[in-house]
Amino acid sequence: MIGRLRGAIAEKQPPHLVLDVNGVGYELEVPMTTLYRLPHVGETVTLHTHLVVREDAHLLYGFYEKRERELFRELIRLNGVGPKLALALMSGLEVDELVRCVQAQDTSALTRIPGVGKKTAERLLVELKDRFKAWESLPGTFTLVSNGPNHADPVASAESDAVSALISLGYKPQEASKAVSAIKEKDLSSADLIRRALKGMG
């Protein structure tokens, strides 16, 4: 299994990216929380990875932090949660935000994510609560940490990147475009645009 990759970012097309590792391009799908923190195309990054093997494809998922990968692995173990829904959950919420939702059994944040209704949110929170209790015994797993530097995308492409990211989360193209266009602040990074758009659609 491929557990970690270090290389230069060759392409960024949310939620996908291509990592050039010694001349070999690895295509990965990443949550928006990882995408927010990636450097520019051409710069080097290390990603923790998880490989899903299917009959018709080998799918590689990348994460900025190891604990994000561990959360992804926990999520896809849950009944009815595949990689797509797991990435949507992790794109809509930071790890610590999701942990707080589980601890408080708060469904409101989860139901803002496409594909997650109230019943699904309630079930996920109940199933995750016991798993997170086990995680709390692991040093550093849930300590609140800084997200690190936020490498803003070029302003000219920020809006299109944000729209693409929202579409990848399950929103319709018209909804995504409308939500981004409704944001009045100028010169925001794609990460900030995505966050504001998600709040506006919540």
Curated annotation (Swiss-Prot):
GO cellular component: a single term: Holliday junction helicase complex
* Keyword DNA-binding among record annotations: yes
Locate the region Domain I: 1-64
Keywords, sorted A to Z: Cytoplasm, DNA damage, DNA recombination, DNA repair, DNA-binding
Picking any one GO molecular function of the record gives: four-way junction helicase activity
User: Where is this protein found?
Assistant: Cytoplasm
Record-linked SUPFAM superfamilies: DNA helicase RuvA subunit, C-terminal domain, Nucleic acid-binding proteins, RuvA domain 2-like
Stretches assigned to coiled coil? none
Instruction: Specify where the region named Domain III lies, as residue ranges.
Output: 154-202
Question: Which residue ranges does the record annotate as region Domain II?
Answer: 65-143
Q: For the region Flexible linker, give the residue spans.
A: 144-153
Spell out the subunit comment: Homotetramer. Forms an RuvA(8)-RuvB(12)-Holliday junction (HJ) complex. HJ DNA is sandwiched between 2 RuvA tetramers; dsDNA enters through RuvA and exits via RuvB. An RuvB hexamer assembles on each DNA strand where it exits the tetramer. Each RuvB hexamer is contacted by two RuvA subunits (via domain III) on 2 adjacent RuvB subunits; this complex drives branch migration. In the full resolvosome a probable DNA-RuvA(4)-RuvB(12)-RuvC(2) complex forms which resolves the HJ.
UniProt function note: The RuvA-RuvB-RuvC complex processes Holliday junction (HJ) DNA during genetic recombination and DNA repair, while the RuvA-RuvB complex plays an important role in the rescue of blocked DNA replication forks via replication fork reversal (RFR). RuvA specifically binds to HJ cruciform DNA, conferring on it an open structure. The RuvB hexamer acts as an ATP-dependent pump, pulling dsDNA into and through the RuvAB complex. HJ branch migration allows RuvC to scan DNA until it finds its consensus sequence, where it cleaves and resolves the cruciform DNA.
Q: What's said on domains?
A: Has three domains with a flexible linker between the domains II and III and assumes an 'L' shape. Domain III is highly mobile and contacts RuvB.
Recorded family membership: Belongs to the RuvA family.
Q: What is this protein called?
A: Holliday junction branch migration complex subunit RuvA
